[in-house]
Amino acid sequence: MEPIVELRGLSKTFGSGAEQVAALQQVSVSVEPGEIFGIIGLSGAGKSTLVRCINLLERPDEGQVLFHGKDLMTMSTKELRQVRRKISMIFQSFNLLEQRTALDNICFPLELEGVSRAKAKERAKELLEIVGLPDKANAYPAQLSGGQKQRIAIARALASDPEVL
């Protein structure tokens, strides 16, 4: 079976000269469809950099990022945008839009995909049920606890039914 995500020899450095820091050095990972794969490590170990390289939010200095066997590094901007719709990320900082309700935050990625407002709201309500927050649909991020914000971020990441989360 072909891996859904494969990273081959990824390296990423930040800074230059004496200030240069190697965040990733020749990292290779293969994740099969349906596989649960976790990345753990100490603070500053490069976990976030590695995850951001999966959809090229962070471009590695060298190596390959493959999705269904296709190299993301060689894709056009349009092709990469289409692949990114199939890969969702849940970041430690929630990145919720403060001026939008919980429901509207979950609808946001669907709106970007051109889904009708009615269908987006229906999907968002389903996801609020799944994450156990159906009563928070009209709450703004400032009215939510940290755990509730994280669950809204999870629901938002699931909204597009991604192949990789």
Regions found by a protein language model. Name each.
Residues 2-165:
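ABC family nucleotide-binding domain
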